[in-house]
From Swiss-Prot:
Binding residues annotated for FMN, in chain numbering: 135-137, 257-258, 301, 316-320, 342
Catalytic class of the enzyme: lyase
Sequence segments annotated as region (Disordered): 280-306
The protein's name in its UniProt record: Chorismate synthase
Keywords assigned by UniProt, alphabetized: Amino-acid biosynthesis, Aromatic amino acid biosynthesis, FAD, Flavoprotein, FMN, Lyase, NADP
One GO BP: chorismate biosynthetic process
Catalysis performed (reactions): 5-O-(1-carboxyvinyl)-3-phosphoshikimate = chorismate + phosphate
GO CC annotations on file: cytosol
Pfam families: Chorismate_synt
Source species: Thermobifida fusca (strain YX)
Amino acid sequence: MLRWLTAGESHGPALVAILEGLPAGVSVTSDDIAAALLRRRAGYGRGARMKFEKDEVSIIGGIRHGRTLGGPVAIQVGNTEWPKWQKVMSPDPVPAEELEGVARNAPLTRPRPGHADLVGMQKYGYDEARPILERASARETAARVALGEVARQFLRQALGVEIVSHVVAMGSVSVPDDAPIPAPEDLARVDADPVRCFDPETSARMVAEVDDTRKTGDTLGGVVEVIAYGLPPGLGSHVHWDRRLDARLAGALMGIQAIKGVEFGDGFRTAARRGSAAHDEIDVGPDGIRRRSNRAGGVEGGMSTGDPLRVRAAMKPIATVPRALDTIDVSTGQPAQAHHQRSDVTAVPAAGVVAEAMVALVLADAALEKFGGDSVAETVRNLRGYLDSLIVR
């Protein structure tokens, strides 16, 4: 079983991430993790913060000479902007005179609609939003992307699983229903696209949508799809709600900031169909039993089917709107304009990379639940034994 935790604030010295339960022998380096973090920063519509804040990766435990040791993996993602925030975000007390007149230390008393600001202040007893927004920020996803890269390498090396994502909708622009989906070898092409869309014509329309939205001082949401190739049948279980693979994946994806909906395969479209047109019929092909389609998205009864896993996540428009939404100044009780931090027009392309990481972590957990192993070699052996012993093929 895998367990993972992250710690740190948006403008703190670093984010720290710990992954426990990974077998020994997974090949992974700082460069692998740095490359994953660079993918998270890309995408048309990102804000100025992506240009000057850098992710400094340090592996501080669990890996030696490029291979996991079997103990907890600890990764630090440093914040190059920390010197500017050192006094404001200091863990230790700072004399009041040193903070006097520091603009960054001004109380944030105008909570932003759509953020954790207001309810977080109420829940934790703060009279300003800084202590809430620092942890609620999507900056925290950098730590999850770092851990997700380690999980991705395990899945690739132990199971032969490959994960790819792409943007399928941005604002009012969507890829056609019959558009091809990217294969693992297409990931570089997807990443090279400004909005990480696999369809060039749709990509151009998405870029125009971002430009129009920027001109009006607004923000844009969208939908990303994650596809996992090479999964064996039987990850997850039907026996309890919390062991169902789709439930675990949905929870992980809903835990990403600004994600408001998740669907598998044809998802909500199946609700409008008759049952005879909603399911995947079964027959026998040259390689054994197979499904004629993949409307279920690679999951049936809470278990992977062996077909490609297809899951989509809907991201709401970023809540920090440049033209500022109406709110209340909690220090005066009077109407006010919401505090505006630097923000993106859209972060949908980056959301796909974060979604990949969460899918990788859940799938790695499910794989270890099924096959176990204190080393990658042991996991591979157990997987082969399982596949060789399948009664129904």
